[in-house]
Every structure is written in structure tokens, then in C-alpha cells.
């Protein structure tokens, strides 16, 4: 039987609430907790619009960029962002825009480029010979839990391994498609998919509902 679902939903909010919440956090006028609370409220509104569907997308929401989200999910964080104080969210925004709340802890932001032929710009993944991956699926697992607690059937949506490698760039003389990066990346995605399959079975969703882009 056919199931009705989509690949994602706009995340900025009907009145650009996310944009204003981001700016408030970066300027120090609001807290991390307030930003995350607003993000959760936007997700709930989005899911409410989709509640008539058989499956609702999770993982489509982002505080800045979905490709950057996948880099952090894989632990592929530029070395220049690893040695600063603050939490994961602060490092996330440093990679995205050069700095987070503390302007003294600034770095070079990641390169931005167009997502294929669209006007959407994503943060380009970086690869080096020393690049290592460390899986952290908590972001999407938390969103799956949120959707499940609302009585919805979640469908994880992520950037797939081939796409992730293809749109990234080498920052040294390494080759992103050599066996070193290729194997490590696919191992992480296999683990990620196993986690999602396990979760989706727990909420009575067929394995085929898992989608990668």
C-alpha cells in the first residue's frame, strides 16, 4: 500500500521566528535554552501541518544547515573549531559563520556554495588525510523521540554518504573518494542507518521509510 509523506518542511517559521531567535542568541540577548525551545516549537508546528500524512520527516529541521548537521553527526568537525571553549552548539555556529556568542573565539567559517542548481547555500564538508569520524546521532534521535511523543510516525531523512562525499572538498592533498575516507564514511552511515532502522521498528514503521538524499 502506498504511503504519503514528503522529504522535508520549511524550517524558518511562518514569521521567520528561527532567524530572529538565532540573532538573539548570537548577540547574547537570549539563551541557548530559549533558542532550542523555539526550535522545538517550530518542529511541532511543522509536524502538526503534516499530521494527516502516513509518515512525518525528522532530521529535516536545522538550526543553520543540514549538510553542516551531517558533518557534526559524523564528527567531521574542522580542527580549527575543536579547541575552543563552549558546547557543541557554539562550535556548530563557529563553523557556520566564524563565531558564536563570544566574538573573541572566532575562526574562519566553512565555505558556502550552492546546493546543486538551487539558490540554497550549504556549508561545504572538509576532508583531510587526518580526518576522522565519530558518530553522534543524538540530534536526529531526539527529534524522532519528539515526533513519537506527539503520536506521529517519524521517517528519518539525512544527507546520504555518496552525496556527502561528493559535495565536500579536500583541504590538503588527500582524495575524498579514496578508500580511507570512502570506507570510514560508509561505515558511519551503516551504523547510522542501523540505529534508525532499530528505532523505526520500535515505532512500527517499515524499513523502507528511511530516506537518504
Language-model segment annotations:
Residues 1-213:
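Domain-level signal for soluble alpha/beta catalytic cores
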Amino acid at each position: 500500500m502506498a504511503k504519503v509523506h514528503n522529504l522535508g518542511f520549511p524550517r524558518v517559521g511562518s514569521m521567520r521566528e528561527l532567524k530572529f531567535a538565532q540573532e538573539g542568541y548570537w548577540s547574547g540577548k537570549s539563551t541557548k535554552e530559549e533558542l532550542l525551545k523555539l526550535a522545538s516549537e517550530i518542529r511541532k508546528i511543522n509536524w502538526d501541518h503534516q499530521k494527516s500524512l502516513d509518515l512525518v520527516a525528522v532530521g529535516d529541521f536545522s538550526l543553520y544547515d543540514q549538510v553542516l548537521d551531517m558533518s557534526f553527526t559524523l564528527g567531521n568537525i574542522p580542527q580549527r573549531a575543536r579547541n575552543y571553549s563552549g558546547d557543541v552548539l557554539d562550535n556548530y555556529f563557529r563553523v557556520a559563520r566564524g563565531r558564536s556568542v563570544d566574538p573573541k573565539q572566532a575562526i574562519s567559517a566553512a565555505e558556502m556554495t550552492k546546493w546543486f542548481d538551487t539558490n540554497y547555500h550549504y556549508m561545504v564538508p572538509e576532508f583531510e588525510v587526518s580526518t576522522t569520524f565519530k558518530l553522534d546521532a543524538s540530534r536526529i534521535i531526539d527529534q524522532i523521540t519528539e515526533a513519537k511523543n506527539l503520536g506521529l510516525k517519524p521517517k528519518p531523512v539525512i544527507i546520504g554518504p555518496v552525496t556527502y562525499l561528493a559535495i565536500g572538498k579536500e583541504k590538503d592533498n588527500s582524495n575524498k573518494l579514496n578508500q580511507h575516507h570512502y570506507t570510514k564514511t560508509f561505515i558511519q552511515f551503516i551504523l547510522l542507518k542501523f540505529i534508525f532502522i532499530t528505532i523505526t521498528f520500535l515505532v512500527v514503521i517499515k524499513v523502507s521509510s528511511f530516506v537518504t538524499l
